[in-house]
UniProtKB/Swiss-Prot annotation:
This is Aromatic amino acid aminotransferase. The keyword Zinc does not apply. It holds the Pfam family Aminotran_1_2. It comes from Mycobacteroides abscessus (strain ATCC 19977 / DSM 44196 / CCUG 20993 / CIP 104536 / JCM 13569 / NCTC 13031 / TMC 1543 / L948). Its EC number is 2.6.1.57. Keywords: Aminotransferase, Pyridoxal phosphate, Transferase. SUPFAM superfamilies: PLP-dependent transferases (SSF53383). Its cofactor is pyridoxal 5'-phosphate.
Amino acid sequence: MPARLRPELTELPAYTPGRNVPGAIKLASNETVQEPLPSVRAALAEAGSLINRYPDNGYAELRSHLAKHVDMPPEHIAVGCGSVSLCQQLVQITATVGDEVLFGWRSFETYPLVVRVAGATPVQVPLVDHTYDLAAMAAAVTDVTRLIFVCNPNNPTGTVVRPAELRRFVESVPPHILIAIDEAYVEYVREDFTDSLALVREHPNVVVLRTFSKAYGLAGLRVGYAVGDPDVITTLGKVYVPFSASSLAQAAAVASLGAAEELLARTNDVVTERARVTSALREAGYQVPPSQANFVWLPLGERSTEFAQASAEARIIVRPFGTDGVRVTIGAPMENDAFLKFSRAWR
């Protein structure tokens, strides 16, 4: 007799990662193409000699450095195995059967998965112009809303909400509902942007999520952090899987913060390429929403899968999202050139 599993998980779709095809250009997972800095590699080498020991489960050194980075005390900071694990923890501490978790759609595909695993109900509010519709989200709040995700910049569309709109939204939400502002791509933003940390200081029900996977180039090590009210941070720790951020990840994150200026200067190259790719795609006849992330979004609708399959045949791997569109990571200039050549021919 097979083991009895939770029946409600049967229809739950599995997370679909970006494809890896040897020898192909991978523009599917929003990774940086640049290697870790020498100082980060040196920190990893040193930490590697101690991997026979468990990592610091309290992240004392990393939290101390993060506290300086965000100019807030360490008790306002939680560390996780990437910000995605913190998303799951936020759901776990706020929502259960009969509760609702609210977010725009299409957005980060992990949101509905972790909500359903918790037994809660995901409420997806359609985007407007590929951007979070905060007015509609405010109207969707009910007596059983427990958590709201605002992905900003939004993944996979790359758009951001106006600072004044986000502030008004936060102020309109009842204070017992937690608001998670997911800023995985914040380092790539170049237009007027919300001071989310100010919102954390002003509103105990706001928490900000950030990651070292994108601009800091540590996607393979899995480390992210949350900034929020100490009560929220303490409760996150109660549902945290011990030792899930390795000693290597912690050492690399500390070293990366020490080299933050050099690392973040690299984002300027991505932003320059983002503008070039966006302009070229628009000239080729594509609709491309304004992106503030390290990728662009092509709302191709029913042709999304066709485009992605043809791209794969050309040895360029992009990320389709059902019948909504295709997300394309900004890669190295030569990789972007290859993608643009394919896109012009396909069009």
